[in-house]
Amino acid sequence: MGHETEISKRYQVAKERYQAIGVDTENALKTLKDIKISMHCWQGDDVKGFLNPDGELTGGIMATGNYPGAAHTPKQLRQDLEKAYSLIPGKHKLNLHAIYVDTDEKVDLNEIEPKHFTPWVEWAKEQGLGLDFNPTFFSHPMFKDNYTLASPDKEVRDFWIEHGKRSRKISEYFGKELGQTSINNFWVPDGIKDCPIDRYTPRKRLMEALDEVFAEKLDEKYTQEAVESKLFGLGAEAYTVGSHEFYMGYGITRDKLICLDAGHFHPTEVISNKLSSLALFSKGVMLHVSRPVRWDSDHVVIMDDELIEIGRELVRNDLLGITNIGLDFFDATINRIAAWVVGTRNTQKSLLKALLEPTADLKKMELENDFTSRMAITEELKDFPFGDVWNYFCEINGVPVGLDWLKEVKAYEEDVLLKR
């Protein structure tokens, strides 16, 4: 009890300090509690899935490491996810890829139906979670010559068009069953290793294939689609069909959400700087918060400058209402549950940091060219007791404070993961 009282006491001191500069910490905590993070299932098993778990991971991505304890069945994955969610404050969502089917039936990607994901839906209901979805355009024999929807081979295109259509029905099913809009994100890794002669025709094929996938109108109360660009992948270094410009044009003209993945751009390019522009022209954004180290390496998200900047952009520009925040990283060199917990809690921390700024006052200073005050206040804020507010948020949401969560992860590793 003394431990809790100490956290509460420290919070009261922090609350007064923030109050002195016009920041209401109670409001900040209330806002943060309502923000759902879509945690990705694929960190739990290194992107293997359950459709063909022994198959090769393709699509220009790579999971490195062999830390023990990866999930091998849907039941194990759900068990691990439950442990992770128990260490993260608030109620969130789970982001599923199509290869995470849960069925005894032998089924291919162009045959999947809502019934193949019913166990996930029943579990999400029990846990109070929402579900997002992703068709899987990789790790499959029909990913031919680095192409799926942009393939010159009609048979290949048709297979993937059918997969895309079926994924929409599954996402719609999630939305109907769970009462939360399911975001269905389309990332298509099609590309060419070396300099292509014709960049135009594959993009035209991709555009036409996507138009066919999206032809049927679905109720956006249940499902909304996002389209995700990428600069390059392994084996597609020279050219990716679904570039940023392609999907910006496609998303805006087809009324789709634009997905921005932190690792899918040039190494010195940041997605935080793109949010305000997209907010002016697109219907909304799906974020894949990730950490690229020299390339799209999908490292676990840490509290670095870009994560802090993403939080600031969303809060300062009032973009939380049109932004869906998801995570996308997979590191097999560390405990996978710890990866989820660190990445999700850090994303929440970046939002809290931004919510604890006197945003209206700072905007007024900027408008009046009072750059001295703007700099002085933003610099002083760096030393404010943000950690005490975060610890209190964890406490009132019934999750471990500080490093206490790590003890739970280590115990779970000993009792469960190392016995697999």
Curated annotation (Swiss-Prot):
- Where is this protein found? Cytoplasm
Q: Which reaction does it catalyse?
A: L-rhamnopyranose = L-rhamnulose
Q: Which cofactor does it need?
A: Mn(2+)
Q: GO CC annotations?
A: cytoplasm
Question: What Pfam families does UniProt report for this protein, alphabetically?
Answer: RhaA (PF06134)
Q: How is the cofactor bound?
A: Binds 1 Mn(2+) ion per subunit.
Annotated disulfide bonds: none
Tell me which positions the record assigns to the signal sequence. Answer: none
Mainly resides where?
cytoplasm
Pathway of action: Carbohydrate degradation; L-rhamnose degradation; glycerone phosphate from L-rhamnose: step 1/3
Keyword Phosphoprotein listed? The answer is no
Alphabetical keyword list: Cytoplasm, Isomerase, Manganese, Metal-binding, Rhamnose metabolism
What Gene3D superfamilies does the database record attribute to this sequence? Divalent-metal-dependent TIM barrel enzymes
Which EC main class describes this enzyme?
Answer: isomerase
What are its E.C. numbers?
5.3.1.14
Give an example GO biological process.
rhamnose catabolic process
GO molecular function annotations of the record = L-rhamnose isomerase activity; manganese ion binding
Q: Where does Mn(2+) bind?
A: 264, 296, 298
Q: Which HAMAP family match?
A: RhaA
| Family to which the UniProt record says this protein belongs | Belongs to the rhamnose isomerase family.
What exactly does this protein do? Catalyzes the interconversion of L-rhamnose and L-rhamnulose.
Q: What is this protein called?
A: L-rhamnose isomerase
Top-level taxonomy: Bacteria, Bacillati, Bacillota, Bacilli, Bacillales
Q: Which gene encodes it?
A: rhaA
